[in-house]
């Protein structure tokens, strides 16, 4: 099974890339998609999200029967979850209005432009990086063998730039994101 977080789908500009996992043939039989609107609409921390569990997503039980994951998910949500507060639901609904979608695209455009400027600067300096296209983040290796937290401190103190240390992403974390 594939669990697909579509938090960054609104940053995708390449028309050949899928914005939903369900744009890929066969995904309804093997994938669940969720999105919090944290990146699309700045809803970080509000606990407003959606989850798509297709009716086609079924599993075989040990006794040879089938089990609908869609039905199990619905049962779980109805039993354990009291719902998102009304004020957050109202704000979430506004995201999907014409005006809300326009405002979201304006904000995303701001982040895209920041990524473009950072990428342009890194290219001019000859610094190899990844990201910045179809994503708001740019990742590059820390210089001179510095650890990512050490480079984070250096950037903050010397350039007043805040990045994300790669150490939190595993053992190959000698990278930083800006």
Region locations from a protein language model:
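PLP-dependent class I/II
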Residues: 1-178
């Amino acid at each position: 099974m594939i669990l697909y977080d579509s938090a960054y789908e609104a940053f995708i500009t390449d028309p050949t890339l899928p914005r939903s996992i369900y744009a890929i043939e066969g995904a309804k039989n093997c994938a669940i998609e969720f999105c919090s609107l944290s990146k699309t609409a700045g809803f970080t921390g509000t606990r407003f999200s959606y989850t798509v569990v297709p009716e086609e997503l079924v599993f075989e039980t040990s006794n040879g029967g089938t089990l609908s994951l869609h039905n199990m998910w619905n049962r779980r949500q109805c039993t354990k979850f009291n719902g998102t507060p009304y004020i957050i639901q109202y704000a979430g609904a506004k995201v999907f209005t014409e005006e809300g979608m326009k405002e979201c695209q304006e904000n995303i455009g701001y982040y895209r432009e920041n990524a473009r400027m950072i990428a342009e600067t890194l290219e001019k300096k000859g610094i190899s990086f990844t990201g910045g296209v179809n994503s708001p983040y740019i990742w590059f290796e820390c210089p001179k063998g510095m650890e990512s937290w050490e480079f984070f401190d250096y950037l903050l103190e010397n350039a007043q730039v805040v990045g994300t240390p790669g150490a939190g992403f595993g053992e190959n974390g000698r990278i930083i994101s800006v």
